[in-house]
Amino acid sequence: MPVLHNRISNDALKAKMLAESEPRTTISFYKYFHIADPKVTRAALYQLFTALNVFGRVYLAHEGMNAQISVPASNVETFRAQLYAFDPALEGLRLNIALDDDGKSFWVLRMKVRDRIVADGIDDPHFDASNVGEYLQAAEVNAMLDDPDALFIDMRNHYEYEVGHFENALEIPADTFREQLPKAVEMMQAHKDKKIVMYCTGGIRCEKASAWMKHNGFNKVWHIEGGIIEYARKAREQGLPVRFIGKNFVFDERMGERISDEIIAHCHQCGAPCDSHTNCKNDGCHLLFIQCPVCAEKYKGCCSEICCEESALPPEEQRRRRAGRENGNKIFNKSRGRLNTTLGIPEPTE
């Protein structure tokens, strides 16, 4: 029986990937389609991906598939062909190729079965996820940005919006996508006559969000096909102005893709212009925050003097201190709330 999980340590896998000489390509894709038995599908896909030396993160559910992966450059077309042939619903699926990429984004394959491919908290049996808003292409996005009747809604987390977003886009202040959905409806109630344009990194969140807005009585709803990644790629290919400002946060080792030269965020420790995310080097924290090179040296990659001191302790003492304490290894969620308490950043005003 084939092994459907990793047997090598994470550190060893990372070292092996970094030592590879063959270039890799970072790819993301998603598809809402019915999967009768996600566990059976996982077993088959795991073998397919492993045979092509694919690394990354893949989520499967009855509602579809969501993936961010790294593929050896020589295997990309074979991977595409085999993915398209795997299920008729995947034929011709758009694969988002990373914009700013050295391929060293993942070093292990993790494939999980979940209740949903994106956690939305929706339990309304009458909700139709297929009744989505209209797609917008790059040129149409730019036209909408110039339309005074259009409102752009960012369906990403605070730490993503903080380092980059479309011109004048509205942030939905929440720690998770499931919290954003009802807030988006509430915030837009007074703007039902407006054109609502929703966007996210690769399209998966804004597609479902557009269906949720329509379910709640909004009729003028659009979403950007392929999200920020596809928009930026097509705008560059077509010689259009790129109207996304700053950096596009991504959920892999890179933590961001440079879209424009502007740096719109600031170091969370000294306030200097900076949009480089990092995780606190203290294994008992791992807070995701923005840190400039000066503060990285001053605090040795940690988020505070306390973490700096703790990370310098002998490993056994660090483990003793972490025992019974909530581990901060929540890299990609609840960032704003955790920043408020850890770094002393004031709560946002309403």
UniProtKB/Swiss-Prot annotation:
Lineage: superkingdom: Bacteria
Annotated active site: C200 (cysteine persulfide intermediate)
Q: What InterPro entries would the database entry show?
A: Rhodanese-like_dom (IPR001763), Rhodanese-like_dom_sf (IPR036873), Rhodanese_C (IPR022111), TrhO (IPR020936), TRHO_N (IPR040503)
Instruction: One Pfam family, please name it.
Output: UPF0176_N
Query: Hey, which family's this protein in?
Result: Belongs to the TrhO family.
Q: Does the UniProt entry include the keyword tRNA processing? A: yes
Return the protein name.
tRNA uridine(34) hydroxylase
Q: Which organism does this sequence originate in?
A: Shigella dysenteriae serotype 1 (strain Sd197)
